[in-house]
Amino acid sequence: MAQPPPQLPPGWVAQWDPNAARQVFVETATGRTSWQPPTAGPAGVAPPQQHQQRPTHPQGQARMSMPQIQPPPGMRGPSLSPISQHGPGAPVSPPSAGSPAPASIGPGASRRRAYPTAHLAANSISYAGGYDASTATGAGVAYPGAQDAQPQLFTPGAPDLTPSPYGAAAQPALGAPGLAPAPGAHGAPGVGPAPGYAAGGVQGITNQFQAMGVGGGVAGGMGQKFSTLQTVNISGVQPNVNDLERPPPEIRLPPNACVSTNPKANADPSYQRCTLNAVPTTSSLLQKSKIPLGLILSPYRSVREADGDEPVPVVTDTVIARCRRCRTYINPYVTFIENGNRWKCCMCNISNEVPQLFDWNSETNQPADRWQRPELNHSVVEFIAPREYMVRPPQPPVYTFLIDVSYQAVNSGMVATAARTILETLDRLPNSDNRAKICIIGVDTSLHFFSITPEGTEPDMLVVSDLDDVFLPKPNDLLVNLTECRAGVEALLQRLGDMYKDSLVTGSALGAALQAAYKLISPIGGKIMVLTASLPSVGPGALKNREDPKLLGTAKESTLLGAASSFYKTFPIDCSRSQVSVDMFLFAPSYTDVATLSCLPRYTGGQTFFYPAFHAGRAEDAVKFSHEFSEVLASPISYEAVLRLRATKGIRATAFHGNFFVRSTDLLALPSVPLDQNYAIECEIEETINAPFVVFQSVVLHSTSSGERRIRVINLALPTTSSMSEVYANADQIAIATLLADKAVERSIHSRLEDARDALFNKLVDVFSTYKSTMTSAGSGASPQLAIAQNLAQLPLLVLALLKHVGIRQSSSIPSDLRAYAQALLTTLPAQQLIPYLHASFYCLHNMAPEAGTTVAEKGFVMPAKLNLTSERFERHGLYLIEDGQNIFLWVGREAVPQLCLDVFDVANYGTLRGGKTTLPKLDNSMNQRVNAIVQRIRDSRRGPYRPHLYIVKEDGEPSLRLWALSLLIEDRFEQSPSYMQFIGQLRDKVNGGS
């Protein structure tokens, strides 16, 4: 049986060497290393030899030599720049006993030795964990001492002084959106104040290493050290929009918190993140900070090779170790005891037996290395579940399409576009084992079933007009195996677009169609995909047009955002019990009651898509819907799922947000789990936490389309603290804003929109007031400044963006359908997509840098510099791009030169340019190619099925389109909403008034 990690002598830490795939032991006081665990001895005492050589690779190949050195203050261990006389990768042996000492450098150098670095150029082991890739490639060294460091995105070295043919001089370019900034990436040292020179002696060197974040990764180090609190004044200061792309505060766990030194042993923020990366030990401290404690999770984040994503490791031997008391799954934060025969749970501290086959490789029938098991090295892992995790065998993927065939739907081209998209996507449906089943039902004031048999190629239409007691004609031929009946399915889809071209029926019996689909697939479960362009008007679930312009912008507007019929609340609960999910694709020539119909996906784990004023005659509409519909159809299915959160004793989940049904106090039922769907869980501290760190474990038990029952486990470990300053220094403003968006939507539906807006502003006032009274010298007195921790400096900007968002904004001109759909997005978009949806990206295109819009070797695709969201950036001759992930606007100034119009839009001048929804032409000139590349990059860079529309907005063009684009410039005053500077002034006055 594998042995647990040895207890290290004082002054030694274990680090992970990814090249050797094993641990290396580092003496932090001297820098010497060893492959073998050090023996106990006086801390910090070096062996008799002058220099210690780096241990030999386990396979006998010499890795590199490493003289005993003292790194300069502020550097991350030995990850330093190479000296010129040694090429990258050249190992340097330690100097011989009689060799001269290195030359001194700088004033006072005679009292300090120089820092040899050449031997660290190629394969330097970073004291933050593993090999430092940036150093190996000759990049600059990241260090935690740059006080006001900005994200290190690409910027051309020399500004182009050649005037742009379209206006002012070129701007510098920044890295593409969606790419993580280099400094402070997850698991790397964060940005903090520059540490001073440490005191002399071994203790001084130790302090240097602590300041550099040594051991501050997953496994801890010499001592637990939290992110440094940096207070900034945001009053009168323009927000730095690039801060929104910075990673959350670094998670710094105490030493020996983790059984593995693998840097992936803690959850990536894209899977699971917490509003606080240092959890208060008491409820009183949490409440005093006014920061909500919550988790933001996206358990099925899409894996994209283009982004460097790695697939989730899978444990295939069905050996699953769980705590016998709290049922926690074994993870990197448990403790092995009794010579590795038992493990102590990190949640409830009870000891459990290690399974007999835990150290056995079932494929080779040989003993296995315990420390290589995925569940002990990775924060996100999947287990193939044995039979005891199955109520029934995993069912096949089932797709039931309810397609509106009324006059409105046929006339808009929706029916033909949907049929063509399904036909083209049949080969991409999850059907690897040929078990997928499909059913198509047409809906107007009657139900149109299609009987398909394996032998025939011509489907039979069966019409049912009795809506009060729906029955299924030929039920065995309605839901058919896709592989066996492929010819009949294709024949139906090819004819469907023309079958109803002469129909004049205008009603919709959607409720009866839903009941029929449920009756058909409830024994199996599966997906009901509704495509409708009509308001349900007859039969069960019939709705009336309740849009009342007089209610918009009033206290009664919230009545338009809840379900209008109880049918749409009770029916999805029945679906959830039978593992049936509903996806809604809504096409709106007029009022569709999105608020009511979106209840179906909300309680069944589905998705809502909305296409206002859809008409397939516009190529842009057809392409957007076809792309999004096919992406949803082709995405891997995780169905028959339940989600549960477990946390360290003393922490309890109190509220849940997202698309699911709460089956019990802590169990969420999800008939399907879409890719890139977001969920939020609020937590509270019930009792004092005595542990040095806490663990949150999210578990999703689900079935795959290939017939496997799997368990996805996501672990997040966070240190605890009793210090208010450490609570603020470790707050994650992105996670906080995501949770506040969920709470605001819920408040607006169950109370009033005004209450939701007030709650957002009051939460901001509470946080700033508490920070001012506890963390600043101003205390309770009035102050002209507005102080907050640097990592929370953009929280007011995000709250203002939420207050100005179409889902929450005070306005009498926002149709309830648009507001309801925006709220559906606010509660389901993962944080990486939600923040751009709240705070749009703004670029100047007419004078962007020469490299912007192109792919540069070793730099990737280069985007223009991001601008603050204010119309002050507009120039009358300019071309600008504003995008929020759902729509892209090209703003064209009224004095745009003819050459710009010709190069980009292929029109002679501004006067002949038409505004509105469009597709850019592809021309043979650099400017057009770069703008097209930027638009395509924006569409491709974010996860999820969405394809944003592109609009041309002329400065003096259509007023409604112009106001729509301007509403995204949240730093400006808009309608009743204040500008950013006015908002900060109101916040400062409120904070001073309440002090």
UniProtKB/Swiss-Prot annotation:
Its main location: cytoplasm. Component of the coat protein complex II (COPII) which promotes the formation of transport vesicles from the endoplasmic reticulum (ER). The coat has two main functions, the physical deformation of the endoplasmic reticulum membrane into vesicles and the selection of cargo molecules. It is a peripheral membrane protein. It comes from the Eukaryota. Residues 323-348 are annotated as: Zinc finger-like. PANTHER family: SEC24-RELATED PROTEIN, SECRETORY 24AB, ISOFORM A. The COPII coat is composed of at least 5 proteins: the SEC23/24 complex, the SEC13/31 complex, and the protein SAR1. Golgi apparatus membrane; Peripheral membrane protein; Cytoplasmic side. The keyword Nucleus does not apply. This is Protein transport protein SEC24. Zn(2+) binds at C323, C326, C345, C348. Residues 36-61, 87-109 have a biased composition (Low complexity). Residues 6-40 form the WW domain. It comes from Mycosarcoma maydis (Corn smut fungus). One of its GO terms (molecular function) is SNARE binding.
